[in-house]
Amino acid sequence: EYRDGNKKIAPVVAPRKGGVTIKREGYTTRRYAPPLVAPKRGLTIDDLNKRGFGEDLYSQITPEQREAQVLGNDLTELSTMIDGREEYMAASAMLNSGYVLKQYADDYGEKYEEFELFFYDGESDDSKYTPSGHWTDVDYDIIGDLRAMIRLLTSKGLPAEDLVFSPDVTDDIIKNKAIKELLDIRNVNIGTIAPIELPDGASRIGVINIDGHDINLISYDEQYEDENGELQYFMGEGNVVLTAPASGRSLYGAVSQLEQSDGRFHTYMANRVPKYTADAEAETLSLIHIPSPRDVEES
């Protein structure tokens, strides 16, 4: 559900006239079908009879004990992969107010269908700002662009605190003449440890004040491996996003699945839903994590 903010002020009323009725603002309800994220890994008796990673050469671990270790490691690895997919979706939502995902039915990287989900109405995204020049020019008015981006947020009653950008943009910002003058180098304490907690891949290179707004300059260089085995930046190249903490949220859909234990369907409300299936004839065990993430980065 969404409700547009406003900048209305209360009316002035003539004496002895009571009050002036102000209509309540309406809201919009949208229904989304979230995408399915389901990495799967098989486990066979051959896997359990082999020495595991990090085990002693003459290990005394039984296949039964090794099964618990392997499944635990698989759960951790698959969950980390899901974290990466969620981060990819969040970054795409920040950059494009939505995302286009590839849905695979068989082998990863082969045939797929596209899944599209966007969080704006109409043909274009009105929250996207296009500069009039190139930030690579040290004399270009980056401050003017940031001022315009700030107003896009504050005009809707939203805060502007963090400028998150691709690693290749870092040099453009640092070398800009106007930015150099605004960077607060007076607060650099030589020999003093003053850590700032930031997610992996995020580096705060400074703080600038624009019209009373303290803007954190954050370079984000975290990467992921795509379907072709190539490393890509979550933020892509040449991208800048002005946002604020807690400006988005993650929503998860319910997962209904047939359980092998009782042969019945069960529905789960959780961000991680494991599914175990066993094939007695083929002696295999499959593990599937099935979350339904929907990352909405609100502008």
Where are these regions (language model features)?
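C-terminal structured domain segments
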Residues: 231-287
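Conserved small/polar residues in nucleotide/adenosyl-binding loops
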Residues: 288-293
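Extended, polar beta-sheet/loop recognition surfaces of beta-rich domains
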Residues: 296-298
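Assembly/oligomerization interface modules of large self-assembling protein complexes
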Residues: 1-56
